[in-house]
């Protein structure tokens, strides 16, 4: 038996095959029988389990949603953080150190009109409390609903090469001059608002069926997951802390995913940027991976808005593979942008002038494969100043199979302007703007009367009283750039840290000032309406209207910077004696009296004796203010001379290389450009004066009609009566018939 057990069978052994096959078949038969027995048992138990499952399902919430990849919404997202890449070889541009000048003149040391020791004690106590406040802020930030058009400005600016600086400055003036203009909101002399309404027939002829619009607005999505978005996009949204889409997003995203053209209107802060960026990223998930091409172009009126949109797209698409964004805006390095556009990024965010410049002069940049065109802030893009640039861009962009998305805070343009955009049966989505302020906003009004000269001292007294430790974000709105700059100097000499934001600053200065304000390095930001448009920084506690706006809508836009997402906020307005100022106050009070809003509108009591004492200090520093302005002007001239000297030396060193470069071209000659500007000014002015909206509208209608309309003369009326004598005797169809009766 031992020998038989030790016997090793060969491959040719028949016994091995027979024994192995019999055993395997037996095992298979046994396993099959066991499975059949299990199935029989299961089939018998099925009716009982069905009854139990039905009882359990009654307790299950049908609206339950699983957490995506186990990622919870972040609670530490503090606004948009955008950064601009910088080459290691680049040297930062020199700017005038205004703070250094103010320190040499005795400013930025201690607050005027207060005891320095008391201020130091207050600062020590505030530092201890601030550590606790920072922890509480991190916990509370998850409760804040940040507007999707907000952004952080943590950017280091790209710097222009010295030999290219003057050329690029000329191009910026030519292509993006619109970014540096601070224009006031136009209001008619009679207080009438411009209202370009189209007939119902024309709108029905141009827009898609109203049923689509109604169905789009009626769809209410409680979460982004019900929008049937892909997992990478949902993951990016969850990382940003966004779970519930806003009304404009809920209505426009499904339509945009179908490839339809959209004309959408919603107020600033409603999430317009994500409303078009989410469907764009969703569409780019299915792009051909082998061929790199620019498929999306987003047009914005300002540089800051373009940089913000780029950061929003990067944050939402951070988990999408091979998704690239490019930037084409003025004020940044032109050569570096050309290198970036050579890689043909999927999405290019641009201002109109710089985009035309790159299309005409950058050899490797092509838009032949463009699929989606987005026009953000369309109300400004369709103004007379941008009309020529838009026409040129639309003539260069392919029309076939192109989806056009048009978004705006206000939409009062004519049908003919939209037809020029080559929209094909667009779906019209208009979300009604709020005509009242936030519920937890306290609106305070200070009646200035005939004390306009005390406004700088009044502003300093309020800032010192409201925020003695300078730990709150305060935005001060002014109407002019000169006022913003002078206020910064005055408050700086009085010992207060202040920054400014307006069109006269360079791009690097703008970004640095907003970044310092966001990080509370500088707690007060003085800005104009145009510079602050589209800018949304979280947790602004106080808004001060140093100069009242021109309309109630602009007033709501200003005070809407604070009291967001159920937080408390305060707005303080310096009200003058003009009719427009009083009307704004009346409208604000009326909105509260209607019972729709629970906010408060109060008159703030001011210690005018203290303000007059502070005004004496301000007046005593008038000579120092003039010295600061002169020194700043001289420093700017020195920097300009140094730049010209560096450029001349570079021209001598690299003369052949610079002359070998092809000359950059523009679609308009200087003669045509001046002609267009004069035509625009003629439409806006008459005999050197501003024309109100009613008269300007009549001028436009007359221009469109192409001349004076024909009116019947007396001879024509007599001949008509002779042809139709019954009209003379009949029902009094003519005035002559009535007289004869």
Swiss-Prot record:
One of its GO terms (cellular component) is nucleolus. A motif (Q motif) lies at residues 222-250. Residues 35-44, 686-697 have a biased composition (Basic residues). A motif (DEAD box) lies at residues 376-379. It comes from Scheffersomyces stipitis (strain ATCC 58785 / CBS 6054 / NBRC 10063 / NRRL Y-11545) (Yeast). ATP binds at residues 266-273. Residues 610-657 form a coiled coil. This is ATP-dependent RNA helicase DRS1.
């Amino acid at each position: 038996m031992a020998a038989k057990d030790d016997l090793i069978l060969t491959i040719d052994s028949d016994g091995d095959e027979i024994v192995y096959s019999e055993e395997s078949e037996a095992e298979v038969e046994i396993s099959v029988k066991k499975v059949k027995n299990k199935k029989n048992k299961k089939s018998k138990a099925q009716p009982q389990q069905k009854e139990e499952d039905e009882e359990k399902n009654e307790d299950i919430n049908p609206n339950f949603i699983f957490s995506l990849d186990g990622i919870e919404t972040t609670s530490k997202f503090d606004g948009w953080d955008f950064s601009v890449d910088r080459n290691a070889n680049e040297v930062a541009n020199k700017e005038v150190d205004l703070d250094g000048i103010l320190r040499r003149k005795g400013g930025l040391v201690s607050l005027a009109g207060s005891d320095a020791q008391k201020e130091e004690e207050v600062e020590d106590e505030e530092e201890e409390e601030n550590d606790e406040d920072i922890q509480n802020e991190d916990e509370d930030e998850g409760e804040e609903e940040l507007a999707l058009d907000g952004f952080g400005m943590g950017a280091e600016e790209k710097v222009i090469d010295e030999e290219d600086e003057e050329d690029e400055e000329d191009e910026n003036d030519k292509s993006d001059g619109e970014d540096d203009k601070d224009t006031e909101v136009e209001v008619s002399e009679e207080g009438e608002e411009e209202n370009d309404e189209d007939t119902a027939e024309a709108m029905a002829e141009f827009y898609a069926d109203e049923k689509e619009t109604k169905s789009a607005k009626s769809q209410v999505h409680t979460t982004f997951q019900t929008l049937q978005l892909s997992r990478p996009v949902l993951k990016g949204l969850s990382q940003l802390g966004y779970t519930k889409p806003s009304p404009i997003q809920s209505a426009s995203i499904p339509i945009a995913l179908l490839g339809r053209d959209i004309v959408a209107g919603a107020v600033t802060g409603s999430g317009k940027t994500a409303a078009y960026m989410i469907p764009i990223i969703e569409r780019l998930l299915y792009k051909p991976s082998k061929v790199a091409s620019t498929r999306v172009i987003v047009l914005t009126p300002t540089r800051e808005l373009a940089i913000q949109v780029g950061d929003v797209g990067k944050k939402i698409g951070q988990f999408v593979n091979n998704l690239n964004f490019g930037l084409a805006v003025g004020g940044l390095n032109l050569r570096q942008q050309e290198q970036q556009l050579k890689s043909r990024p999927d999405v290019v965010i641009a201002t109109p002038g710089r985009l035309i410049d790159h299309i005409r002069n950058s050899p490797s940049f092509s838009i032949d494969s463009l699929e989606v065109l987005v026009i953000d802030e369309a109300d400004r893009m369709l103004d007379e100043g941008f009309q020529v640039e838009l026409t040129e861009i639309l003539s260069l962009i392919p029309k076939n199979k192109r989806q056009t998305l048009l978004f705006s805070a206000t939409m009062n343009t004519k049908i003919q302007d939209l037809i020029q955009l080559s929209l094909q049966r667009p779906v019209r989505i208009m979300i009604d703007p709020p005509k009242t302020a936030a519920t937890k906003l306290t609106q305070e009004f200070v009646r200035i009367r005939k004390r306009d000269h005390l406004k700088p001292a009044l502003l300093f007294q309020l800032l010192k009283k409201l925020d003695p430790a300078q730990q709150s974000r305060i935005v001060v709105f002014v109407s002019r750039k000169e006022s913003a700059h002078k206020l910064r100097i005055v408050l700086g000499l009085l010992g207060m840290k202040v920054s400014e934001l307006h069109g006269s600053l360079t791009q690097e200065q703008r970004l640095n000032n907003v970044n310092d304000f966001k990080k509370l390095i500088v707690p007060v930001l003085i800005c104009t309406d145009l510079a602050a448009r589209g800018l949304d920084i979280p947790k602004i506690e106080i808004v001060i209207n140093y100069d009242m706006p021109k309309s109630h809508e602009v007033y709501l836009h200003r005070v809407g910077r604070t009291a967001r997402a159920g937080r408390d906020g305060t707005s303080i307005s310096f009200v003058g004696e003009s009719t427009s100022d009083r009307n704004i106050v009346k409208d604000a009070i009326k909105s509260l009296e209607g019972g729709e809003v629970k906010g408060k509108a109060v008159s703030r009591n001011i210690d005018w004796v203290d303000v007059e004492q502070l005004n004496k200090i301000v007046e005593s520093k008038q000579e120092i203010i003039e010295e600061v302005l002169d020194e700043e002007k001289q420093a700017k001239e020195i920097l300009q001379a140094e730049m010209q000297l560096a450029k001349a030396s570079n021209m001598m060193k690299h003369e052949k290389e610079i002359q070998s470069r092809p000359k950059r071209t523009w679609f308009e000659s200087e003669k045509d450009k001046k002609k267009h500007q004069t035509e625009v000014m003629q439409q806006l002015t008459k005999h050197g004066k501003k024309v109100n909206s009613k008269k300007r509208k009549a001028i436009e209608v007359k221009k469109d009609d192409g001349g004076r309309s024909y009116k019947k003369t007396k001879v024509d009326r007599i001949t008509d009566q002779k042809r139709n004598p019954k009209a003379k005797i009949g029902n009094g169809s003519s005035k002559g018939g009535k007289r004869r009766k």
